[in-house]
A protein has these predicted regions:
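Conserved N-terminal glycine-rich FAD pyrophosphate-binding loop of Rossmann-like flavoproteins
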Residues: 71-92
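Dinucleotide-binding Rossmann-like beta1-alpha1 core, especially the glycine-rich loop
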Residues: 85-156
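Central helical "cap/lid" subdomain
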Residues: 278, 287-345
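Glycine-rich FAD pyrophosphate-binding loop
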Residues: 57-78
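Conserved flavin/dinucleotide-binding core of flavoenzymes
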Residues: 59, 133-134, 282, 300, ...
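N-terminal Rossmann-like FAD-binding beta1-loop-alpha1 element of flavoenzymes
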Residues: 40-64
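Active-site/ligand-binding neighborhood in enzyme catalytic cores
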Residues: 162-271, 280-282, 300, 310, ...
Length: 488
């Protein structure tokens, strides 16, 4: 692997994200670029790009993967918190029906272990703290009941939305003209129920319900399954038999690390792509340090970044409009490290939900051996935007108070604190997923996965099933690889 890509280099960058600026494209700079050729060039070494590369190489074709960062993994990123102990600052959970990421992990020797889910979850509404069983994930408290009362309706509507073409749903235009927030207000009677629903929305999308098209949200629900299993809203926010059921041993980034290791020198780090020049049967991909001539290119980066690449000729107007209107989420991860998972002593799972912010949905993120203890929570939507104006020290103090409300005073006794802030990462610019507001998906959606000549597109925002998740990224890479191989 290029640029002395040891395993240490792959994991590098976990403590922070470097700010990078565009470099001037002088003649001298062009002369210094390494000129390469391949059947396929792939932009981005996240799970989508690496999966596409793996499948294309296995079919006997040449590939070069250009990655802007000094590591692989995209929106998966490990951070070491002790000898042999990692936590994840990005995507981490996997669960039933996420078949493709689980198959890829097995193929490269990465095992899973169950998310800690024993004992009771904590619910806080109007300052009142109650417990409910982690095994079911449901409380009989009135606000909680109100919040989940809309799930049957959401699931029924989502069943009418096809994952391959949600814009063809019978009521696509009607639903795309509404927001999820409008649906919430019309169907959840209590203030507390709406607040708990919003907490789930922020954790799932990193956005406010008012920012999401109802059609987009229904597509997302429909996508939380596989061809044999219909999607459901419960599968998005629950732990047992749902999206948060399991984690990867050695951290989620380990999957990308192992795939990249097998690709070897085909993966080139610290090579941000600036321009793609496409012809009828060839394409030239221009990066800061490399220039690749290929027969096809796969752009496997978030839409907000794909839109920042220069294209010659320009992308079709509708494709460019869609890339501009897929808005990255605002989601932070705040993580506290403790000597041990003390909450387990009190029979608590480390999970919960509150109507107050900013840290509304905690999880036990401890390693398989149980120590050190780690708690994390998502901070999403408006709470994440407000947090961007605060210091890390303020985040830590706020997080300590939030966790103490859930799990008692011992939560203030942190031995370490970490956070994942993807909005400030120039090569992501938001997390966990891009979303669309009103009147986008029904009109521009057909452009989502559509190739443009020799340019193909991958990434979790182009997935059918598990759009927004690691599984969706893998599925999109597999689909893009199939497209390219058919064209060669």
């Amino acid at each position: 692997m290029n640029r002395t890509l040891t395993r240490r280099r792959f994991v590098a960058g976990a403590a922070g994200m470097a700010v990078t600026v565009a470099l001037p494209r002088t003649a001298a700079a062009r002369r210094r670029r390494r000129r390469r050729t391949a059947d396929v060039c792939i932009v981005g070494a996240g799970l989508a790009g690496l999966t596409a590369a793996r499948n294309i190489v296995r079919s006997g074709r040449d590939v070069i993967v250009l990655e802007a960062r000094d590591r692989v993994g995209g929106r998966t990123r490990n951070a070491q918190v002790g000898p042999g102990v990692v936590t994840e600052l990005g995507a981490e959970f996997v669960g039933p029906t996420q078949d493709r990421i689980l198959a890829l992990a097995r193929a490269v020797g990465v095992d899973t272990f169950p998310t800690y889910n024993a004992g009771s979850n904590v619910l806080i509404v109007d300052g009142q703290r109650t417990l409910y069983p982690a095994a079911t994930g449901f409380s009989e408290q009135s606000a909680f009941v109100d919040a989940v009362s809309v799930i049957p309706a959401l699931d029924a509507m989502a069943a009418q939305v096809g994952v391959t073409a949600p814009w063809k749903a019978p009521r696509a235009s009607e639903w795309d003209a509404m927001t999820l927030g409008q649906f919430r207000d019309a169907n959840i009677p209590s203030t507390g129920g709406r607040a708990l629903f919003d907490a789930a929305v922020r954790g799932i999308w990193g956005a406010e319900a008012s920012e999401l098209s109802l059609l987009f949200a229904l597509f997302y629900v429909a996508a939380a399954g596989n061809p044999q299993t219909p999607g459901s809203f419960v599968r998005l926010f629950s732990t047992p038999n749902a999206a948060q059921e399991s984690r990867f041993v050695r951290g989620s980034q380990e999957v990308a690390i192992q795939v990249a290791r097998r690709l070897g020198s085909r993966v080139v780090l610290e090579s941000p792509v600036r321009r793609i020049e496409s012809g009828s049967d060839t394409v030239t991909v221009v990066a800061d340090h490399d220039e690749v001539r290929a027969r096809r290119v796969i752009v496997a980066v978030p839409p907000v970044l794909a839109n920042r690449i220069g294209y010659s000729p320009a992308l079709p107007r509708t494709k460019a409009r869609l890339l501009r209107r897929i808005v990255p989420g605002n989601l932070l991860k705040w993580e506290a490290v403790y000597e041990r998972p003390f909450w387990r002593d009190a029979g608590l799972s480390g999970q919960g939900v509150t109507d107050q912010g900013p840290a509304q949905v905690p999880f036990d993120n401890s390693p398989p051996q149980g120590a050190p203890g780690i708690l994390f929570s998502f901070v999403g939507g408006d709470f994440a935007r407000a947090a961007q104006r605060q210091s890390t020290a303020e985040h830590q103090a706020t997080f300590a108070e939030n966790m103490a409300a859930f799990f008692g005073d011992e939560a203030r006794n942190m031995t370490g604190y970490l956070e994942g802030n993807w909005t400030t990462d120039p090569w992501t610019r938001g997390c966990p997923v891009g979303h669309t507001g009103r009147n986008v998906l029904a009109t521009l959606g057909p452009q989502l996965r559509k190739p443009v000549g020799t340019i193909h597109f991958a990434g979790t925002e182009t997935a059918d099933y598990w759009f927004g998740y690691m599984d969706g990224a893998v599925r999109s890479g597999e689909r893009a690889a199939r497209e390219v191989l058919r064209s060669l």
